[in-house]
């Protein structure tokens, strides 16, 4: 796990989610020192944002495919 301020763009949604779940478990169990927990929390925020971005991209792609498949489809606004 790297604690850089940026996250590799090529990390998959599944890998990011798995790492985020591991971070949450460690923090919840108190398995890290305060400093490490803060660093892990920072990494967790980056992972969460990355996962949200990937989900939004997937949703937009599905909407685009749906529009192309049937031009009469009406898409409802969804919260991201």
From Swiss-Prot:
GO BP field: DNA catabolic process
Subcellular location: Cytoplasm
Keywords: Cytoplasm, Exonuclease, Hydrolase, Nuclease
GO cellular component assignments: cytosol; exodeoxyribonuclease VII complex
Enzymatic reactions: Exonucleolytic cleavage in either 5'- to 3'- or 3'- to 5'-direction to yield nucleoside 5'-phosphates
Major enzyme class: hydrolase
E.C. code: 3.1.11.6
UniProt superkingdom: Bacteria
Gene Ontology molecular function, alphabetical: exodeoxyribonuclease VII activity
Pfam families linked to this entry: Exonuc_VII_S
Coiled coil: none
Assembly behavior: Heterooligomer composed of large and small subunits.
Family: Belongs to the XseB family.
Function: Bidirectionally degrades single-stranded DNA into large acid-insoluble oligonucleotides, which are then degraded further into small acid-soluble oligonucleotides.
Name of the protein: Exodeoxyribonuclease 7 small subunit
Organism the protein comes from: Rickettsia akari (strain Hartford)
Gene from which this protein is expressed: xseB
């Amino acid at each position: 796990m790297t604690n850089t301020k940026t996250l590799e763009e090529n990390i998959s949604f599944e890998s990011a989610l798995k790492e985020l779940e591991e971070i949450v478990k460690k923090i919840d169990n108190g398995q890290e020192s305060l400093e490490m927990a803060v660093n892990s929390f920072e990494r967790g925020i980056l992972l969460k944002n990355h996962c949200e971005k990937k989900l939004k991209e997937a949703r937009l792609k599905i909407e685009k495919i749906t529009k192309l498949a049937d031009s009469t489809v009406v898409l409802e606004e969804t919260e991201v």
